[in-house]
Amino acid sequence: MVPGRLWRRGVLAVAAVGALLFVWWFVTTPPALPTREGHVTAVTTVGKPVFVGVWSTGSDFGRELHVAGVRLRADATVAVDLEPLLCRGGSVGVTSDPAPFCRELLDPAGTTLGPGDSLVVRVVAEEPGAVYLDRPSLAFREGPRWGNREAGTEAVLAIVTP
């Protein structure tokens, strides 16, 4: 083998590995989703679900996310049921009935989230207590890119006796 050819092959191999690493990085690191400081505050009674809006995309949201799932993490003083929901075509602050605010209320896994949609968490507990809900983490694909990103805001809830 001629030394020039060996050197050229080495450079090509390094360039190919570098290109593959760049493509892997690009595909697995989509841009961050909007987050907000502070938190949403809600109060509900034992056994009564409350719907808390934790992220609203707004009509100027220029992205379309194909949602694979939503992960919720909460610290609570009592057992609590949490269910992420996609509010299609609307947004919710805090309510016991999201129907007037959402065109559709769906399981976000397998749906597309776009402008004017929002993420809502249904919270219900069978005992009085407190819940601190972290920002939701969305697993999504956007074009060729996919990843997990936090979005929206945190929530603090009080569950009281009726």
Model-derived features with residue positions:
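Non-catalytic macromolecular-recognition regions in eukaryotic signaling proteins
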Residues: 2-162
